[in-house]
Amino acid sequence: MIDVKAKLSEIGLTLPVAAKPVAAYVPAIRTGNLIFTAGQLPLVDGAMSLTGKIGEKISIDQGKELARICALNCLAAVQTVGDVNTIVKIVRVVGYVNGIPGFTSQPAVINGASELFLQIWGESGKHARSAIGVAELPLDAPVEVELTVEVRD
């Protein structure tokens, strides 16, 4: 079993409190041994850390860090319906990148989320993934990430 909070602490991070939904949904839902999160934005202490489009006023490296924040927020969402320490496999990551027209580096941005999961879970952090470019995101967020994990009973 991995102590997720300890692993986060080792890399200078802490598990945040889950953000309150901005509409009619829940942060995460469990069915069987799977937990699905709602899309998580790069909120820090309830506020958007940066807004706008990647490739305009936000660099790919900044976008990658925002995806990492989204990934942390996904773990916080998992914690609302279970315990992050029961995660046995990162199954799927879906990342949405609000980029300028012609922006095609979505995978580089979403690596910020993927790399965090690999740092924490190693081999069990390997996952299927989609990195999708979009014209806009809620609250003018540059990045949004969804997570599916398998947990033990």
Locations of regions flagged by a protein language model:
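Short, polar/acidic, helix-capping and beta-turn segments at strand->helix junctions
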Residues: 1-153
